[in-house]
Amino acid sequence: MKRLPRLALATALFAGALAGIPSLAFAGNLPAAIDGSVAVMHTNDIHGSYKYSYNASKGTGTVGFDGLAVLYSAQNSAPDLLLDAGDTFHGQSFATMSEGKSIAELMDTFYVDGYDATTPGNHDWSYGANKLRTMTGYSTTGTPFAMLCANAKSTSGVWSSSITKTLDRTWEDSEDHSTFDYKIKVGVVGAMDESLGSSLRADLVAGTSFSSAANAINAEAEQLRKEGCDVVVCIAHTLDAKTFATRLRGVDALIAGHEHINLNEKVTGADGKTIHVVEAGSSFAEVGMLSIPYKYDTNGTETTDDDTVTVPADDSNEKLYTAKNVNDLLADPDKGSDYQSRLEAVRNKIKPLDEDFENESNKVLGTSTTNYFYGEDAAGTHGWEMVRTTDFRPSKEGDTTKAQTIGHVICSSYLDLTGADLAIENAGGIRGGIAAGNVTAGNVIAISPYGNTVETWTMTGADCLAALEHSLQISDDCNDSYELQQAYVAAGHTEQEAHDKYKWRDDSGSVLSFGGINVTIDWTQPEGKRIVSATLTKDGSTLDPAKTYTVATNNYIITNTTDFPTFAHATKYTEWGTCEAALRALIGQDSWESKMASLAGTISFGSAAVDPTPTPAPTPKPSPKTDTTATKVITKKTTGKLATTGDRTLAVVGACLIGGIIVIMLGIIWKRRR
């Protein structure tokens, strides 16, 4: 222990020795309890995002590792811990093309000692359990972070459950400036919800099993307390963080991942104590700063053997930082240049990783003998519009070269990867095409840039058909908008003016490309009955409404139960790799186009399958005895046959009724006159 001034300490020691006192009272004004806090900076679900960017007009952006260094250095004192709650090494192509190595290296080296620990998210297992377990220490200059998963057991290696970190603290007397040194020991335990493990590809987790995450955390927390930890923090990738926290004991705070939400709530744990539960969004859009308070009980003496620490978690607080905060710091008139230096220092570490990524992106995966355009040409002209419309309409000019076959390529890659019965991909997830010639990894990334992952789900044939039918209706409405926009542009207006006047449906991105089935569409049929034939490409069997099928799709559209209510009936089966990785795997094969053609299926149209043009209702001729004020007749477009006005049967019935009424009235008059 350190005591100042030294003269006061010497006097106390001498007096104590004379009196034979075993413990010594502090010569200054040492309080009975010292208030302090443990600062934990944290991230989750960054999904391979890594570089700072900011859109001032929208006020949104990505913090990235370089922005994180700015936020880290801007704190009044350095955070005590930097933790991550999973889904870190997989997502963006920058991460997946190096199998997570690029992200792991930045976590080790981006600033000071880098991260202290992370825990696996469900997507992080995409490179295999052994690769993930050793996903640290790539950099020779950084301090390796810990990969924690207390509930994972592997036949090929041991998973770490926890780490401890001892924090040096100093209290200073405000009057005589004497100081008192003490230590706070913090334990960190990590785990992944065992239910997430059940959806992972079996080959990726071969030899690895998952026990109850809550039980494993509780057991490890108890052990950490026995080892003298004053504060215990849990990092967990879990389906429902708040519910999960109610099952925990001996934990002061839960830093969660997986839900992609901003969470900041206090929950009562299984031991009756408060647990602060936090989560910081996703994709590095936010960074959290959790302050965990403690009271260090000194007993008013300089000895620390019998000192105790309590954590009043009810008083803890959380703050979220975004790219806007980074932008504000960089623009600070006093310290902005210092923060800019921090940013550039990390970017210098990112630069060689970017160069490696660019080299990988330029590698040729395979060749294409034809165009699979996104739009009218290789440049993607009108791709956004055409991927929502063209594939599902019989061409009026007989030109099939503009059909958006890129959707079929994508769906085929999903089928090839998973062996599923059917595949679907939403138009909003497609952002590029393939031109004839060499196909590079960069071309594939442009097609599927979002880092979405392939998943297989089970659903009935009836639910599949209902989703496809609704997609056709969305596409039909999109087609109407697009034709009106084209006509408006042809009349001399700009494309933006056309878009503003004839707007797209809000759910236009939910138009589905599909694969694994041969579909015949009859546009003369009403909504919900336009698919008149659907057979599987794998065996030629008819899609059975009562049968259950395996459907491969991306993890985004399958959760859209607003546009597709029947998706709520689906059951998740397996998680695979990223969508762009599936494309890379297909295009890298010899004769990949032949395989694609055999998997994709076809879209054809019934004998009467033409763009439905409703027959306009005839304008009624005004009677000389009626009001001749103009009346606007509004007709609603239908896809079936319009009802015919002036029906002959109705006219005969009406005439009979009128004649009968006249006869009755004449009879009454004749009777009264008699």
Predicted regions, residues:
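Acidic, metal/ion-coordinating pockets
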Residues: 28-322, 401, 406-409, 574-578
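Sec-dependent signal peptide cleavage junction
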Residues: 18-34, 643-644, 648-650, 670
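A short C-terminal boundary segment appended to hydrolase-like catalytic domains
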Residues: 177-180, 294-439, 587-610
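C-terminal membrane-anchoring or membrane-association module
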Residues: 655-674
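Bacterial N-terminal signal peptides that target proteins for export
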Residues: 1-8
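Feature captures C-terminal
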Residues: 34-39, 49-52, 63, 144-151, ...
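Bacterial N-terminal signal peptides
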Residues: 10-20
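C-terminal low-complexity, Ser/Thr- and acidic/Pro-rich disordered "stalk" regions positioned immediately N-terminal
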Residues: 605-647
